[in-house]
């Protein structure tokens, strides 16, 4: 949101280039992991063979509006909590509640029986290499590497074209996020993967709540974090990648705020401000598809 506003209001592409660098590094890294057989992206939670087009459209619109009203997305909320923002603490709990309702509660039933019934069935998983592999004679692994290098390289090129962008903070911000995403894919899809669970004799991904391969996500893990805290005495509730990432973001943001002396308490400025943040928190996970 901040990157888009910088471009539209000030014609400043610095943060947009940071995002572009992060996206490019992540795409290239994941493509290399997949092409070398370390992970299988077709087994991730994001690549089913059903394209839920209406859920995706409505969810994206809700998320966009919610992000503006709540002063940021799920990850930004965690950063603001670490910096002393009490408004974001409220957003965290409301968003966690609504996300749980959307995953397993009232909104889940509504979602599954309405807009999730509208989808496009695909003959393969919905990642681009799998789709193109069925249309060409090129092996999927080769397509993963080629497309990853081309698309990811284009994002990296856009970021680095501006010489003024070549500063340590910009490169660390973009490159660091991209490398973190690659690391999470590796942990989720390779390190935490068992080809045959002794109990079920089926393959399993150990470190995620969904039981499938995931990358960094900061909305559904809100619900999982609250669930873990509320049912802490239940030994079946274990720390997962998403829950640890939520805690790590808050702790990291807090330490950064202390070291840079930017930590300060902040709260709502009035009824309108409170209402906007509450509505924004609800919209952030009134996205029908539980894939975030």
Located regions from the model:
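Membrane-interface helix termini and inter-helical loops of multi-pass transporters
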Residues: 3, 38-49, 109-120, 127-135, ...
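Membrane-embedded helical hairpins/re-entrant loop segments and their flanking transmembrane helices
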Residues: 40-54, 255-280
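Membrane-interface helix-loop-helix junctions at boundaries between adjacent transmembrane segments
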Residues: 66, 70-120
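Long hydrophobic alpha-helical segments that form multi-pass transmembrane helix bundles
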Residues: 104-158
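Transmembrane helical segments that form the transport core of multi-pass membrane transport proteins
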Residues: 168-266
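Conserved small/polar residues in nucleotide/adenosyl-binding loops
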Residues: 285-290
């Amino acid at each position: 949101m901040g990157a888009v506003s910088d471009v539209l209001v000030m014609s400043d592409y610095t943060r947009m280039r940071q995002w572009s660098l992060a996206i490019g590094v992540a795409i290239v890294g994941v493509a290399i992991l997949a092409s070398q057989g370390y992970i299988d992206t077709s087994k991730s939670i994001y690549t089913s063979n059903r394209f839920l087009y209406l859920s995706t459209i409505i969810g994206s619109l809700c998320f966009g509006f919610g992000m503006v009203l709540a002063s940021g997305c799920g990850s930004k909320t965690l950063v603001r909590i670490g910096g002393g923002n009490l408004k974001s603490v409220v957003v965290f709990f409301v968003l966690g509640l609504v996300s749980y309702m959307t995953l397993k509660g009232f909104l889940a039933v509504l979602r599954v029986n309405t807009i999730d019934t509208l989808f496009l069935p695909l003959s393969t998983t919905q990642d681009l290499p799998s789709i193109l592999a069925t249309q060409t004679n090129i092996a999927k692994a080769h397509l993963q590497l080629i497309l990853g290098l081309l698309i990811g390289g284009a994002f990296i090129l856009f970021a680095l074209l501006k010489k003024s962008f070549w500063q340590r903070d910009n490169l660390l911000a973009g490159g660091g996020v991209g490398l973190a995403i690659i690391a999470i894919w590796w942990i989720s899809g390779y390190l935490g993967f068992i080809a045959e669970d002794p109990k079920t004799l089926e393959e399993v991904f150990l470190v995620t709540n969904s039981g499938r391969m995931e990358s960094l996500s900061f909305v559904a893990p809100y619900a999982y974090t609250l669930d873990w805290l509320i049912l802490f005495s239940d030994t079946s509730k274990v720390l997962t990648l998403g829950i640890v990432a939520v805690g790590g973001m808050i702790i990291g943001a807090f330490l950064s705020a202390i070291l840079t002396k930017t930590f300060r308490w902040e709260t709502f400025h009035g009824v309108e401000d409170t209402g906007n943040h509450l509505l924004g928190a609800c919209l952030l996970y009134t996205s029908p598809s539980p894939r975030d």
